[in-house]
From Swiss-Prot:
WWE domain mapped to chain residues: 333-411
Function: ADP-ribosyltransferase that mediates mono-ADP-ribosylation of glutamate, aspartate and cysteine residues on target proteins. Acts as a negative regulator of AHR by mediating mono-ADP-ribosylation of AHR, leading to inhibit transcription activator activity of AHR.
Family to which this protein belongs: Belongs to the ARTD/PARP family.
Acidic residues: bias regions: 1-10
Species annotation: Mus musculus (Mouse)
Disordered, as annotated region: 1-22, 121-154
Protein name, as recorded: Protein mono-ADP-ribosyltransferase TIPARP
GN (gene name): Tiparp
């Protein structure tokens, strides 16, 4: 409650804007002044917009921006500023029910209309859907039928499989749940502590029309202004301030008045200028790169580029050297949490350096090691994972380091409202990716080939089709690959689906033949999805001719002279030779492992199941360990199919800010 006097307020008349004057206000004062009266007036609270309201308003905003309807409502504060300039509405009207005089100019929301002539337009976004946290258990372990959008060849040009492999129409509508998943990062070196966001929206959202039913034009516009205010990004210059988790979830009611940082991600990097001592944000394109590199405990220094000059940043001391333009670096983050399953909190990992490098330990053990170092103890005893450990500190003091758990934008998309996610739909338990065997694609009776395949001309032996990030197959492959290959060391560039009709037919018929001799669980585990590392020069050959056991021995033949496949991508990475451009190549293949036995170096084929019988069936594959196999060796080329090609690269130690 607040006390207010009822002195008559002058009427504010807002004139249309003109180049010569801004927001002129004509005052009409009455001739008589009434006596002052004391009264009580309840302070109005800011409206709280729910997640559903925020999502339903986006198509309205998009329509207004595209049509230019807001050109007379919003204008740039400074026409000479760059694309990060703030925008404000010309008719200055606050969002309270009772209007008052125009507020201060710095209280308006950030908005860039589509019609604004901005140098350096935002790039096209590639949205992604239903992205669980890395390690989220996959309920359906199959690579499901997908819809590949885009232009494909005309089906009338071929006859090979008129009723089997259907061409995919280029007019397939994009799922409304997929469209607004990704924000377009603004290019440029620094954003002036303010960020802009542009969504690709589905204007057919029925919630939008329902939301504005029975509302006047003025009330609807106020609701739009309220939304814009809540979507504004800002950072503060002071240290010790955390990122607002309510804003990440789309529930912060304070807008630009929030005392916490409003950023796109749960982490945000800034660098301080030496002359002004002001913190400025690193370019949006570099935020994830810098975070990815920082999360690796092996990295202490990072090379930075800005304005044609190179300099270095110390990631431990958070200082910048070999330049006079900047002197410090800082990382803004959300509050810490001891639960790694929390998407919005920062989870810190603790590392201790030994003879073999940086080894991760629980925080309690690290604290114990720190205490032993400070007291000069020669050894530390502790129990971890039901085992007793002894660390000897006789010859050196153990170095301790902490780094945050890395979460990529791809993983964060469905959880963050700032990236267009839907937290209510993505609130799944965050656990390690299941190691269960992935079932094969469901092939309908009307289509012998996977429904995800696009049309290919009969003259083509094979094609490689890029997998969209919103496809479920992409997410499954992403989680399988990064289950053993750290995200902070390697980054997936592209995933290609291999379509080879001849090899697919051979593989399916061999699978049917093997299944006839199996029953129950044996049929389920007959087919596995395994990794195979290789070099760029043989990728196309494998896509056309398949994995050839006859050319084995290029890397290893310890368990037999055949084609090698591994459960873990980290093992296959050892045989993935880097190309001249720094790109690695790895296959995720379908493999019919069937019945297996221990392999040996001299085997050119699997041994018989019954050695005493001449007509005995042979084992289908050989393994490195009978009880917990990690490596499978195949001796027949019809027992495998090159399903996907994964292209990835090592995280660079240089970032352009």
């Amino acid at each position: 409650m607040e006390v207010e006097t009822t002195e008559p307020e002058p009427d504010c008349v807002v004139q249309p804007p003109s180049p010569s004057d801004d927001f002129s206000c004509q005052m009409r004062i009455s001739e008589k002044i009434s006596p002052l009266k004391t009264c009580f007036k309840k302070k109005q609270e800011q409206k709280r917009l729910g997640t559903g309201t925020l999502r339903s308003l986006r198509p309205i905003l998009n329509t207004l921006l595209e049509s230019g309807s807001l050109d007379g409502v919003f204008r740039a504060r400074d026409q000479n500023r760059d694309e990060s300039s703030l925008h404000e509405h010309i008719v200055k009207k606050p969002l309270e029910i009772n209007p008052s005089c125009p507020p201060a100019e710095n209280s308006m929301p950030v908005l860039i209309p589509d019609g604004t002539n901005v140098e350096g337009q935002l790039p096209e976004a590639h949205p992604s859907t239903d992205a669980p946290e890395q390690g989220v258990p996959i309920q359906d372990h199959s690579f499901p039928p997908e819809t590949i959008s885009g232009t494909v060849a005309d089906s009338t040009t071929g006859h090979f499989q008129t009723d089997l492999l259907h061409p995919v129409s280029g007019d397939v509508p994009t799922s409304p749940d997929c469209v607004d998943k990704v924000m377009d990062y603004v290019p440029g070196a620094f954003q002036d502590n303010s960020f802009t966001i542009q969504y690709i929206l589905d204007t057919s959202d029925k919630l939008s029309t329902e939301l504005f039913q029975d509302k006047s034009e003025e009330a609807s516009l106020e609701l739009v202004f309220e939304l814009v205010n809540q979507l504004q990004y800002h950072t503060h210059q002071e240290n010790g301030i955390e990122i607002c988790m309510d804003f990440l979830q789309g529930t912060c009611i304070y807008g630009r008045d929030c005392l916490k940082h409003h950023t796109v991600l749960p982490y945000h990097w800034q660098i301080k200028r030496t002359t002004t001592q002001k913190w400025q944000s690193v370019s949006n394109d570099s935020q994830e790169h810098l975070e990815r590199f920082y999360c690796n405990p092996e990295n202490d220094r990072m090379r930075m580029k800005y304005g044609g000059q190179d300099f270095w940043a110390d990631l431990n001391a958070m200082t910048v050297f070999e330049t006079t333009e900047f002197d410090q670096l800082r990382r803004l983050s959300t509050p810490p949490c001891s639960n790694s399953n929390s998407i919005y909190h920062t989870f810190w990992k603790f590392f201790c350096r030994d003879h073999f490098g940086w080894r991760e330990y629980p925080e309690s053990v690290v604290r114990l090691i720190e205490e032993a170092n400070s007291r000069g103890l020669k050894e530390v005893r502790f129990m971890m994972w039901n085992n007793h450990y002894i660390l000897h500190n006789s010859f050196f003091r153990r170095e301790i380091k902490r780094r945050p758990l890395f979460r990529s934008c791809f993983i964060l998309i469905p959880y963050l409202q700032t990236l267009g996610g839907v937290p209510t739909q993505a609130s799944l338990p965050l656990e390690a990716t299941s190691s269960q065997i992935i079932c094969p694609d469901g092939v309908t009776s009307a289509n012998f080939y996977p429904e995800t395949w696009v049309y290919m001309h009969p003259s083509q032996d094979f094609i490689q089709v890029p997998v969209s990030a919103e496809d479920k197959s992409y997410r499954i492959i992403y989680n399988l690959f990064h289950k053993t290959v750290p995200e902070f060391k390697y980054r997936i560039l592209q995933i290609l689906r291999v379509q080879n009709q001849f090899l697919w037919e051979k593989y399916k018929r061999k699978k049917e033949y093997m299944n006839r001799k199996m029953s129950g669980r044996d049929r389920i585990i007959n087919e596995r999805h395994l990794f195979h590392g290789t070099s760029q020069d043989v990728v196309d050959g494998i896509c056309k001719h398949n994995f050839d056991p006859r050319v084995c021995g290029k890397h290893a033949t310890m368990f037999g002279q055949g084609s090698y496949f591994a459960k873990k991508a980290s093992y296959s990475h050892n045989f993935s030779k880097k190309s001249s451009k720094g790109v690695h190549f790895m296959f995720l293949a379908k493999v019919l492992t069937g019945r297996y036995t221990m392999g040996s170096h001299g085997m050119r084929r699997p041994p018989p199941v019954n050695p005493g019988s001449v007509t005995s069936d042979l084992y289908d594959s050989c393994v490195d360990n009978f009880f917990e196999p990690q490596i499978f060796v195949i001796f027949n080329d019809d027992q495998s199919y090159p399903y996907f090609v994964i292209q990835y690269e090592e995280v660079s130690n240089t970032v352009s800010i």
